[in-house]
């Protein structure tokens, strides 16, 4: 994909583990900043990833995204506070604005991603990339929880975007 076509991205990548224990070391190695940047930018500019609810040619020309990698305690607390679900989930998306600048926070729970990747026999980096794409699509207005049509559309778009990033279809792996 043409790098010049990418929108301006202001990215804050946060690792919520002040103790820097060894469990997070593997995650830091699996998810370098350039991989996060590429996944988000590729999602935003994908030809089919138009911003939902806007004109047919509506795209983000700039984005301000915070990606925070958390432990299970913080992941569960955020999920409880904002979704009334008392467990840590793999990704939470807090979308603030679609236009003129796409603005969102993506929270990924490291232990949940590690467990899911191991259970599903997936590469940890590929699983992170999948959930970054998934969370970015949520920030762009896509939803899979309220209709089967929306879920099918979002899943198909994820697969196309991931293919462009060199990641195998996570729903067939």
Q: Language-model segments: which ranges?
A:
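Charged, glycine-interspersed solvent-exposed loop segments at helix/strand-loop junctions
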Residues: 130
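An acidic/histidine-cluster motif and surrounding catalytic segment
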Residues: 1-127, 137-173
């Amino acid at each position: 994909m043409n790098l010049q076509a990418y929108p301006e991205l202001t990215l804050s990548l946060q690792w919520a583990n002040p103790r820097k224990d060894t469990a997070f070391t593997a995650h830091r190695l699996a998810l370098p900043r350039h991989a996060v940047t590429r996944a988000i930018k590729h999602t935003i500019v994908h030809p089919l990833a138009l911003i939902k609810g806007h004109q047919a040619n509506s795209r983000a020309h700039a984005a301000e995204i915070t990606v925070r990698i958390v432990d299970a305690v913080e992941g569960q607390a955020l999920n409880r506070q904002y979704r009334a679900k008392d467990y840590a989930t793999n990704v939470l998306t807090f979308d603030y604005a679609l236009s003129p600048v796409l603005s969102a926070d993506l929270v990924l729970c490291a232990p949940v991603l590690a467990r899911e990747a191991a259970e599903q026999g997936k590469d940890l980096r590929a699983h992170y990339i999948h959930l970054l794409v998934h969370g970015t699509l949520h920030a762009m207005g896509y939803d899979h929880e309220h209709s089967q049509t929306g879920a099918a559309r979002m899943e198909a778009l994820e697969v196309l975007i991931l293919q462009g990033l060199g990641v195998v279809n996570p729903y067939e792996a």
